[in-house]
Amino acid sequence: MGSKRSVPSRHRSLTTYEVMFAVLFVILVALCAGLIAVSWLSIQGSVKDAAFGKSHEARGTLKIISGATYNPHLQDKLSVDFKVLAFDIQQMIDDIFQSSNLKNEYKNSRVLQFENGSIIVIFDLLFDQWVSDKNVKEELIQGIEANKSSQLVTFHIDLNSIDITASLENFSTISPATTSEKLTTSIPLATPGNVSIECPPDSRLCADALKCIAIDLFCDGELNCPDGSDEDNKTCATACDGRFLLTGSSGSFEALHYPKPSNNTSAVCRWIIRVNQGLSIQLNFDYFNTYYADVLNIYEGMGSSKILRASLWSNNPGIIRIFSNQVTATFLIQSDESDYIGFKVTYTAFNSKELNNYEKINCNFEDGFCFWIQDLNDDNEWERTQGSTFPPSTGPTFDHTFGNESGFYISTPTGPGGRRERVGLLTLPLDPTPEQACLSFWYYMYGENVYKLSINISSDQNMEKTIFQKEGNYGQNWNYGQVTLNETVEFKVSFYGFKNQILSDIALDDISLTYGICNVSVYPEPTLVPTPPPELPTDCGGPHDLWEPNTTFTSINFPNSYPNQAFCIWNLNAQKGKNIQLHFQEFDLENIADVVEIRDGEGDDSLFLAVYTGPGPVNDVFSTTNRMTVLFITDNMLAKQGFKANFTTGYGLGIPEPCKEDNFQCKDGECIPLVNLCDGFPHCKDGSDEAHCVRLFNGTTDSSGLVQFRIQSIWHVACAENWTTQISDDVCQLLGLGTGNSSVPTFSTGGGPYVNLNTAPNGSLILTPSQQCLEDSLILLQCNYKSCGKKLVTQEVSPKIVGGSDSREGAWPWVVALYFDDQQVCGASLVSRDWLVSAAHCVYGRNMEPSKWKAVLGLHMASNLTSPQIETRLIDQIVINPHYNKRRKNNDIAMMHLEMKVNYTDYIQPICLPEENQVFPPGRICSIAGWGALIYQGSTADVLQEADVPLLSNEKCQQQMPEYNITENMVCAGYEAGGVDSCQGDSGGPLMCQENNRWLLAGVTSFGYQCALPNRPGVYARVPRFTEWIQSFLH
């Protein structure tokens, strides 16, 4: 076999030029492919622009579940009720979107209607470019959740009710029944080559079955199908009146008792008007009456380049002029209402170039905007309106032409706004005015925040110049303005209203042009309303550090009203070793809502001393250290005069003089002879001389140990000699425990002095001091716990407050309902016959008059306060834990003393206190109970609710509540899935854990994030951290 080299070659090698041309050819093919791809993407972008135009309008609904009440007046858009609520809702929506990720696209909002069902709000949102409905909805929900509007303090919105509907141009066109299938069904058709073509979603085949185009390109006035079938008059004829393309110099279209959408979808009737090139189109509305949700949009032009010029619903807009020979009219039908007659529009063509300057300018706005044009490059549009605008603190109450509510005028957008806006109105091009002419007009600039009105002239040859300008508040009246025009080239006049964020409407009426120079005005030149003083700083210019001799300070603006939402700090200082006395010379605050809090020391380690509110006078406050912090905190409502205070420093201010060595000092500072201490008879007015006369020590629990008695300030150990069971019971009861359980003699290892106990004939204990016990025998006493934490009413087990169930009567006999000024506000737990444990935040600012509080014990149904099981007690003392910090929500616990001791019954029993620092492990199931809200921001319960919740570790709780600092003084409980939780109104109530058939108070309901959300547990004050503090009040 010969080699391959011996076979003659049938191909020759390519030359260098041939290789070069081949490479170039490949590159050109690649470039063509890239250009095709880019063109395709560009076409798709154009299609999208065609669908949505230069601006985008979305319609939304939401439900107000509290903060406003529905009434029939809300159906009347001219009523004060409608205007007030619409203003506040628009303010809320504007606040949210102007602080959102869509703030650059967002323009404004408009409330259309209120419906019953709590209150359902229907509104429109306008954006200057297309945004997805999903994105709009997400931003709105996030803004409400983040409380991005001050209106959300008042309104509570049902987040699940929020819905944003698709934009106008996404709806299908309604056609007559004979042709509707062509627009609503995409069917594969056979091409001449027997090739079946199926269009992608949102596209349809042209009639030639060779090309697919976007559905939105059908019936838009521009030919997109090669055969023109997308604009076929039969295909596009509307179901409203059977018309589509209108081409005469005059004609009409209508939607009389217009058809309703089917299958719960919205629909559109669309008309295209074309007149001769160079002409414009005037639309006269013979009648117009549509439901608020059914909107007629008027566009200048057609197809992808059309510009939205007007959105119309409900009321007759008068005459609309479009300065183009093409108009697209699109009627969006969303409702199924049948009580509206619809509309009829007659159009005529006219030549705007035949108008003179006077015809182009003169306008009283009674029939529309005349020949004035909205400046679409600005932030918003002028509104044609009549009657008063809302709120009444800005804008006119009537027009200038007629001087009553029947006449029309134009105004910058009424209602709230979240940013400054420029709103422009332009003339058509005007002819030069060498003979001079006088432009006159009437303007209305009223409101504290009104900004500026400017009139400018512009031309192609010269830069824009300002010929008239006013700034500020000129009061509640129409003012006359005039300026002479003297232009040598074609020019335009523009009116610009500059709108501030709120309460800043500017109105115009009766614009006219007359021959000749302006004469001296017979109307007086308006004067500015004095500007109100600047807003006061909410921090009072602080924080302030004060030392002697600079010892007097006041709330800001005293004796005039202080600012709302203030948070002010004064740090008072004294030399080391001294303390501080704070005195309020004058004191007048809004009761409860505005407070002055005084703390001992500075910073996080400072201790709570007092909180004052309402009218004075108030008591002096003394520090125990050389520093004192004064906090002034106000809400966003009513403001009063405030306060004037001073302080002095010294040694031992407010501290009683110490007693002599042979005296005992009572808690109130009184001195009594030492021999009277622990003698069985109270000599101190506060009973403190008999409060701590017996104790247990060296025991394994707080209910066992050796017994000690205090005799004249010296502790004596009890001997076992003569000890009896009765003495055990007596000593255990003196300790605040139950009966004696056992007493065992034990050998003494020294450490006297000692005391022998005997029982007197009257049953009292006789104490005899001794230097030694008989046979060195001491008594080791074990007491029973006092009866507590026991349910005495037999009940069935109920199934597993929010997510809870009605409890049975007597199920939780220690749960107490707290009323302030006869309003049920919080819960509490009974821990003895005369003391309750509750939350500090419940009584904060409400502690100055304890008698305004009452406790209802044995309550089951809040609506039945006459039940025989109930006992009601007034409160005569409130003690807030000195470590409580309201801002950090730490140590949120307080004691409340009943004016009269309560009797224990089957329905009234105390709950047990846990051991000091007792541990309740994570995962343990405990119980909560209360009459609080059944859902977040909902109504409170009538029947006492109960539920079980698992405890969480503080580490996990911190992860789930990252915005709070979860301290060792807190315990958390709740399910990861949510659904069960304490809520508003449950504050101060118990978190209860069962142990050894007794219920222990493990926590006090403190705070949470809303109620029962997933991974959002409730947070409670951890009671074992406060057991010793609580017990100090009980014994």
Swiss-Prot record:
<feature type="active site" description="Charge relay system">
    <location>
        <position position="892"/>
    </location>
</feature>
<feature type="topological domain" description="Cytoplasmic">
    <location>
        <begin position="2"/>
        <end position="18"/>
    </location>
</feature>
<dbReference type="InterPro" id="IPR036055">
    <property type="entry name" value="LDL_receptor-like_sf"/>
</dbReference>
<dbReference type="GO" id="GO:0044256">
    <property type="term" value="P:protein digestion"/>
</dbReference>
<feature type="domain" description="LDL-receptor class A 1">
    <location>
        <begin position="197"/>
        <end position="238"/>
    </location>
</feature>
<feature type="active site" description="Charge relay system">
    <location>
        <position position="841"/>
    </location>
</feature>
<keyword id="KW-0677">Repeat</keyword>
<dbReference type="InterPro" id="IPR000082">
    <property type="entry name" value="SEA_dom"/>
</dbReference>
<feature type="topological domain" description="Extracellular">
    <location>
        <begin position="48"/>
        <end position="1035"/>
    </location>
</feature>
<keyword id="KW-0865">Zymogen</keyword>
<keyword id="KW-0472">Membrane</keyword>
<keyword id="KW-0519">Myristate</keyword>
<feature type="glycosylation site" description="N-linked (GlcNAc...) asparagine">
    <location>
        <position position="903"/>
    </location>
</feature>
<keyword id="KW-0735">Signal-anchor</keyword>
<feature type="disulfide bond">
    <location>
        <begin position="926"/>
        <end position="993"/>
    </location>
</feature>
<keyword id="KW-0812">Transmembrane</keyword>
<dbReference type="InterPro" id="IPR023415">
    <property type="entry name" value="LDLR_class-A_CS"/>
</dbReference>
<keyword id="KW-1133">Transmembrane helix</keyword>
<feature type="disulfide bond">
    <location>
        <begin position="826"/>
        <end position="842"/>
    </location>
</feature>
<feature type="glycosylation site" description="N-linked (GlcNAc...) asparagine">
    <location>
        <position position="116"/>
    </location>
</feature>
<dbReference type="InterPro" id="IPR036772">
    <property type="entry name" value="SRCR-like_dom_sf"/>
</dbReference>
<dbReference type="Pfam" id="PF00057">
    <property type="entry name" value="Ldl_recept_a"/>
</dbReference>
<dbReference type="Pfam" id="PF01390">
    <property type="entry name" value="SEA"/>
</dbReference>
<keyword id="KW-0720">Serine protease</keyword>
<feature type="disulfide bond">
    <location>
        <begin position="199"/>
        <end position="212"/>
    </location>
</feature>
<keyword id="KW-0325">Glycoprotein</keyword>
<feature type="domain" description="Peptidase S1">
    <location>
        <begin position="801"/>
        <end position="1035"/>
    </location>
</feature>
<keyword id="KW-0449">Lipoprotein</keyword>
<feature type="disulfide bond">
    <location>
        <begin position="678"/>
        <end position="693"/>
    </location>
</feature>
<dbReference type="GO" id="GO:0032023">
    <property type="term" value="P:trypsinogen activation"/>
</dbReference>
<feature type="glycosylation site" description="N-linked (GlcNAc...) asparagine">
    <location>
        <position position="722"/>
    </location>
</feature>
<feature type="glycosylation site" description="N-linked (GlcNAc...) asparagine">
    <location>
        <position position="264"/>
    </location>
</feature>
<feature type="glycosylation site" description="N-linked (GlcNAc...) asparagine">
    <location>
        <position position="263"/>
    </location>
</feature>
<feature type="glycosylation site" description="N-linked (GlcNAc...) asparagine">
    <location>
        <position position="519"/>
    </location>
</feature>
<feature type="glycosylation site" description="N-linked (GlcNAc...) asparagine">
    <location>
        <position position="404"/>
    </location>
</feature>
<feature type="disulfide bond">
    <location>
        <begin position="957"/>
        <end position="972"/>
    </location>
</feature>
<feature type="disulfide bond">
    <location>
        <begin position="659"/>
        <end position="671"/>
    </location>
</feature>
<feature type="domain" description="MAM">
    <location>
        <begin position="358"/>
        <end position="520"/>
    </location>
</feature>
<dbReference type="InterPro" id="IPR000859">
    <property type="entry name" value="CUB_dom"/>
</dbReference>
<comment type="similarity">
    <text>Belongs to the peptidase S1 family.</text>
</comment>
<dbReference type="Pfam" id="PF00629">
    <property type="entry name" value="MAM"/>
</dbReference>
<dbReference type="InterPro" id="IPR001254">
    <property type="entry name" value="Trypsin_dom"/>
</dbReference>
